[in-house]
Amino acid sequence: MSLMDNWKTDMESYDEGGLVANPNFEVLATFRYDPGFARQSASKKEIFETPDPRLGLRDEDIRQQIINEDYSSYLRVREVNSGGDLLENIQHPDAWKHDCKTIVCQRVEDMLQVIYERFFLLDEQYQRIRIALSYFKIDFSTSLNDLLKLLVENLINCKEGNSEYHEKIQKMINERQCYKMRVLVSKTGDIRIEAIPMPMEPILKLTTDYDSVSTYFIKTMLNGFLIDSTINWDVVVSSEPLNASAFTSFKTTSRDHYARARVRMQTAINNLRGSEPTSSVSQCEILFSNKSGLLMEGSITNVAVIQKDPNGSKKYVTPRLATGCLCGTMRHYLLRLGLIEEGDIDIGSLTVGNEVLLFNGVMGCIKGTVKTKY
């Protein structure tokens, strides 16, 4: 039985399990827009640099799958060689000083290409949107190029064809502000886009003006792999399993099951910190199992645990999609590069003090440490 078939057998029980708080849910994608992923060369203003191709931000196979409307291939990450060599290089980010590819930016089309490179894993985001819409039987005719245009128009607050369009595009490619992008598609196929400015201070603390574009990407999006990473979230392991369904496998606005868990996480973290139970908390996550006791995911992240291979080397293992975890784009990307691998993880094997890797398409990868079970 395929993963899609497994989801279909669960459809009748969604309402009974209280998973669909809002029957008018929207399919959701959230991802990062970051000018640091395609930025102006220090020596030539018409040249924009993007990360080294070895970092795999663009994949021609994925682009071809989109052209062929083969969206289900997203669920089958092609086999790759071990990412051990790449991981070793990533752990020395300053070694990527001159490794990049370039875009000569002279026309509006070139500027749009620069902006496209700044949307993190946009191709994979589009694939995941399409497969989710197909599952929920939602008609959708927006192409990847159309989606890019809508994203740009939202960021510059100007429609293509407007007399100010060219000027605003030019201004946009020179700005440094990062955004959390939200693409929402209704059950009638209507699309809306939100751009939420991200706090820049935490991002700028991770990098320097002298970093290459590849080094910037590694320090901001692959930070959890770095030996000297200073970011480490507090992690709660939930004692209550999550009911795996299409509403855990796909990202939608029906998220009450996650919201309830984050309230329990808030209480657990405040107990640890000696704070009032309802005090706001940040930089923390709660991890769930499914009803079979297998680790699934976090409330806002996918997760990988650290294990040892037969040679004693560290490896990162993430739950299989069959557990019901979100088919996240960052998860897909890390699997594609061989930086993580899939496996079954008994949630009972997680103990206080264990280090984990947390990741999503907005914050990238960060370290976390299990602090308590609750």
Curated annotation (Swiss-Prot):
Protein localization: Cytoplasm
Cellular component aspect of the GO annotation: cytoplasm
Descriptive protein name: Aminodeoxychorismate lyase
Gene: ABZ2
Pfam family membership, one: Aminotran_4
Similarity field: Belongs to the class-IV pyridoxal-phosphate-dependent aminotransferase family.
Subunit composition and interactions: Homodimer.
Cofactor: pyridoxal 5'-phosphate
Organism field: Saccharomyces cerevisiae (strain ATCC 204508 / S288c)
GO biological process: carboxylic acid metabolic process; folic acid biosynthetic process; tetrahydrofolate biosynthetic process
Free-text function comment from the UniProt entry: Converts 4-amino-4-deoxychorismate into 4-aminobenzoate (PABA) and pyruvate.
Biological pathway: Cofactor biosynthesis; tetrahydrofolate biosynthesis; 4-aminobenzoate from chorismate: step 2/2
Top EC class of this enzyme: lyase
EC number(s) from the headed UniProt entry: 4.1.3.38
